[in-house]
Regions:
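Catalytic cores of the polymerase beta-like nucleotidyltransferase superfamily
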Residues: 1-153
Length: 154
């Protein structure tokens, strides 16, 4: 079992109490699984940006077009992003468009590497649809999906 900081747990639990899914996601999960202390925590949720803003008292619409709202939890900024899929990357960095989805697996499938495509909350545990934990144990860096497409995007 992984232990999330109380301010991160608060954001996740608040979203859950309001009927939404929410997970710590990406590098923070990878770092915790490897015994490192994460420097920042990102949250992914099926709540839409306007729902996140409605639920939390202090927010900043940092990347609203891409579904990202920064929730200020006890003075700590926590990037909270709606589950999404992404359109084409014409500049190799940012997608031309994003579409919000209601499925965690679909959101995780857009991520670069399996070790970054894991999500965690204390209620549901680790969500690892692409064998990221196994890849960490084997010290393998593997792309999610088509490697050429992933490297073209990044």
């Amino acid at each position: 079992m992984l232990i999330l900081p109380p301010k991160i747990e608060y954001v996740i639990e608040t979203l859950q109490k309001n009927g939404y899914e929410a997970y710590a996601v990406g590098g923070c999960v990878r770092d915790m699984l490897t015994g490192k202390t994460p420097h920042d925590f990102d949250i992914t949720t099926d709540a839409l940006p306007e729902d996140i803003i409605r639920i939390f008292e202090k927010t900043v619409p940092t990347g609203i077009k891409h579904g990202t709202v920064t929730v200020i939890s006890g003075g700590v900024p926590v990037e909270t992003t709606t589950y999404r899929t992404e359109g084409k990357y014409t500049d190799h960095r940012r997608p031309e468009s994003v579409s919000f989805v209601k499925n965690l697996r679909e959101d995780l499938s857009r991520r670069d590497f399996t070790v970054n495509a894991m999500a965690y909350n204390s209620k549901d545990g680790l969500k690892d649809y692409f064998s990221g934990r196994e890849d960490i144990e084997k010290k393998i860096l593997r792309a999610v999906g088509d490697p050429q497409k992933r490297f073209y995007e990044d």
